[in-house]
């Protein structure tokens, strides 16, 4: 059973619980967008964070800024007494009959009562009326599970793409949430949200001493060594830092090369065990061996550290050199799903090919993972498979 989140002191202004009051914004459409019409893919940004951290405030800010985007908002379960919920038609059984509410500025709001796929599929029928989707999760939601559905559903994949995951952390209560111990060795929700994020907003920095913000920032960086950390007040942020990140597609490979060179390895924060590890291995990887390496980590979960603890990878990102391919290949992994995609960047003839990986997760051992990765590059498939024994599978 999950503990109650927050106390009376943590309760957000009632307005935080309501759907943002949207105001008209001027929108323009380029000739290229008009030509592409319904054929253009629509980016989705997942906004996550604990109750009261400022998710709805960020939504309100994004929707009222002058960004020339027509935005659809998906609220993952409305709060009790939500002003928007009163405007939705409800069936006699108490379930939503009409899921969508179209607002005067062209934006859309909906309540997702199921896994979210049906709602987004319905939203696709309104494609052409908007060009960006913001999906706000509940406070305890695992954004990885939400992110995964965009890779699973092939039909959705042709219409939309996951742009990035934004996690908002409350400056006052964030450290408490991140260090909360869970039973049976489970990872607490706040820590998982931070680990999966492409950008982390430390919000309400004006309400706490600078030293507290510094401690929180250090803790966040110890969990996620790759994501950008931004300090905000009232969730106000340069929109280029949260929208159009291309964090999950091949375009991210262009900036990822430089970023991976400066990712710091981290130590577990306090008594927790989530870390960021990074390593580089020169040479080419055989694609089938690379798949085996990733699958043993994400699917079989049969890789253990020196203390014989199972390694759990929450997020995986990297650039690799695949044998017989001229393009750099980006590797993305969330939960049990992963993808290899060629980037627009080619390997130069006068530079050494190399593989850089960043893994975020629990009980990770850099030395063991690096040696296993080297095995994917240098060993035969027969030799490689002997490294994993059935009786070593983690349960």
From Swiss-Prot:
Class of this enzyme: hydrolase
Keyword Manganese recorded: no
A Pfam family assignment: cobW
Catalysed reactions listed for this entry: GTP + H2O = GDP + phosphate + H(+)
Region (Disordered): 1-22
Expression tissues: Ubiquitously expressed. Up-regulated in cultured astrocytes treated with dopamine.
Record's note on what induces expression: Down-regulated in response to zinc: repressed by ZNF658 in response to zinc by binding to the zinc transcriptional regulatory element (ZTRE) (5'-C[AC]C[TAG]CC[TC]-N(0-50)-[GA]G[ATC]G[TG]G-3') found in the promoter region of CBWD1. Increased expression in response to dopamine treatment.
First-listed, main subcellular location of the protein, grouped into a coarse class: nucleus
Boundaries of every CobW C-terminal domain copy: 274-377
Positions bound to GTP: 49-56, 110-114, 203-206
Placement of sequence motif CXCC motif: 107-110
Biased composition (Acidic residues): 8-20
Database matches in Gene3D superfamilies: CobW-like, C-terminal domain, P-loop containing nucleotide triphosphate hydrolases
SUPFAM superfamilies from the UniProt entry: Hypothetical protein YjiA, C-terminal domain, P-loop containing nucleoside triphosphate hydrolases
GO biological process, one term: kidney development
Motif (psi-PxLVp motif): 17-24
Record's disease association: Congenital anomalies of the kidney and urinary tract (CAKUT). A disorder encompassing a broad spectrum of renal and urinary tract malformations that include renal agenesis, kidney hypodysplasia, multicystic kidney dysplasia, duplex collecting system, posterior urethral valves and ureter abnormalities. Congenital anomalies of kidney and urinary tract are the commonest cause of chronic kidney disease in children. Disease susceptibility may be associated with variants affecting the gene represented in this entry.
Record family assignment: Belongs to the SIMIBI class G3E GTPase family. ZNG1 subfamily.
Function, as annotated: Zinc chaperone that directly transfers zinc cofactor to target metalloproteins, thereby activating them. Catalyzes zinc insertion into the active site of methionine aminopeptidase METAP1, which function to cleave the initiator methionine from polypeptides during or after protein translation. Mechanistically, the N-terminal psi-PxLVp motif binds to the C6H2-type zinc finger of inactive form of METAP1.
Name used for this protein in its record: Zinc-regulated GTPase metalloprotein activator 1A
The encoding gene: ZNG1A
